[in-house]
A protein has these predicted regions:
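Central regulatory/effector-binding core of bacterial HTH transcription factors
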Residues: 8-72
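Flexible hinge/capping segments at coil-to-helix
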Residues: 76-118
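Secondary-structure junction motif
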Residues: 21-27, 70, 110-139, 207-208, ...
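Short, well-ordered beta-strand segments
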Residues: 10-16, 61, 95, 119, ...
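Short secondary-structure boundary segments
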Residues: 65-66, 98, 125, 166-170, ...
């Protein structure tokens, strides 16, 4: 992992709203022993992540491909001269507060969720429908609450009766008071109940040692998680 050197070290990460990408970033920063460094992490909309990497503002972008969004993102990546590398597949889960009427269910259908507000990260106006972080965004819903930060999501889940769909990876701040339940995805076109998590790097970017350390830490953070299936590179 990262060791100190006399040069000014730099690591810049652009990521969707996932705690594992933040955890890996913090662990790399804590391990670095150099005298001069600049570490930057941006939690962004999907389009901003692609643009950050395209313009070299950030060295790496962390994002998720769903069965629906991948159709658009697979075209957007080469258009931006970025290359996507998968890290792991994660099982989709429904997240609700422990007080929620559905909290004790063993499995949930989308019909079960129909009367409850759906929480999602807002993606702005450009390609927002296709750039969603949450799976099954293409399925219409009559109650929507959108926001831009993970803190609001945690607050909503613990204090209200809505839900969100995401990977089965709970962040540390979401362990208390929040329940994850697998959804029944049978009958959903093009869905196998998983999301592909990976990273993008500009095709002309030369990877720094710190960037390599960060990628290794991402793999380590998720290696023992029972809800993910890592890719071997």
């Amino acid at each position: 992992y990262a060791k100190g050197s006399s040069s000014h070290a730099r690591l810049t990460v652009s990521t969707q709203h996932y705690a594992f990408s933040v955890q890996a970033f913090v662990e790399v920063a804590e391990m670095y022993t150099g005298d001069e460094y600049e570490f930057t992490l941006r939690e962004c909309r999907t389009g901003e992540i692609i643009d950050d990497v395209r313009t070299f503002r950030c060295e790496i972008g962390i994002l998720v491909l769903g069965s629906f969004t991948s159709r658009v993102l697979d075209k957007a990546f080469p258009d931006a001269n970025v290359v996507f590398t998968p890290l792991f597949d994660a099982q989709v889960h429904v997240f609700v507060g422990e007080h929620h009427p559905l909290a004790k269910a063993k499995i949930l259908t989308l019909d079960d969720l129909e009367d409850y507000p759906r929480y999602s990260f807002e993606q702005g106006t450009e390609n927002s429908f296709y750039y969603a972080e949450e799976p099954f965004n293409q399925i219409p819903h009559k109650k929507e609450i959108r926001f831009s930060d993970r803190g609001t999501l945690t607050n909503l889940l613990t204090n209200h009766i809505g839900y969100t769909l995401s990977t089965g990876v709970l962040s540390s701040e979401m362990h208390t008071g929040i329940v994850s339940i697998p959804p029944d995805t049978r009958g959903l076109p093009g869905s196998n109940g998983t999301m592909q998590v990976g990273y993008i790097i500009h095709s002309q970017m030369k990877r720094s040692p710190l960037l390599e350390d960060y990628i290794s830490m991402l793999e380590n953070v998720m290696r023992d998680n029972p809800f993910v299936h890592p890719y071997k590179h």
